[in-house]
Amino acid sequence: MAEKRNIFLVGPMGAGKSTIGRQLAQQLGMEFFDSDSVIEERAGAEISWIFDIEGENGFRKREERIINELTQKQGIVLSTGGGVVLSKENRNHLSARGIVVYLQTTVAKQFERTQRDKKRPLLQGVEDARQVLENLAVIRNPLYEEVADITLPTDEQSAKVMANQIIDLIDNFHG
């Protein structure tokens, strides 16, 4: 890869964005950011607390500011939150400022990966988490597809294998 272009990872919760993003950044010698972690750092609070106090709208406003800021950096790998694509502004920034990789996963795999995770505000206190994930997929999957330059399924691969696949695809990407 001659010049280091930004790589932005999008996809649903449990797709492996953070794990794959760290691996990718390490292999490419690029700086890694996780937008949810940056939001928590700046707020001095966990995302679940932000959701409780400010609601999803308050969180999404914070997310827009952070996405705008981080996507202006050069040569980074950015793992985004699952709902990042709900904002047209975020989709525009991601599309214009880097290569967007959509990490696809099935609802079954998402459920398996997130069922014991207490840091998923949209899944807290719900009767049927699988149904919530299915509902989110109906709304968000078309938006991930809209913004993606590259789409990869993540269900059966390790983070290292996924990172290598992304590197190969980006080396051949001329968008």
Curated annotation (Swiss-Prot):
GO terms for cellular component: cytosol. It catalyses: shikimate + ATP = 3-phosphoshikimate + ADP + H(+). Its cofactor is Mg(2+). InterPro entries: P-loop_NTPase, Shikimate/glucono_kinase, Shikimate_kinase/TSH1, Shikimate_kinase_CS. GO terms for biological process: amino acid biosynthetic process; aromatic amino acid family biosynthetic process; chorismate biosynthetic process. GO terms for molecular function: ATP binding; magnesium ion binding; shikimate kinase activity. Pfam families: SKI (PF01202). Binds 1 Mg(2+) ion per subunit. Its main location: cytoplasm. Pathway: Metabolic intermediate biosynthesis; chorismate biosynthesis; chorismate from D-erythrose 4-phosphate and phosphoenolpyruvate: step 5/7. ATP binds at G14, A15, G16, K17, S18, T19, R120, Q157. Signal peptide: none annotated. It is found in: Cytoplasm. Its EC number is 2.7.1.71. Catalyzes the specific phosphorylation of the 3-hydroxyl group of shikimic acid using ATP as a cosubstrate. HAMAP family: Shikimate_kinase. Belongs to the shikimate kinase family. This is Shikimate kinase.
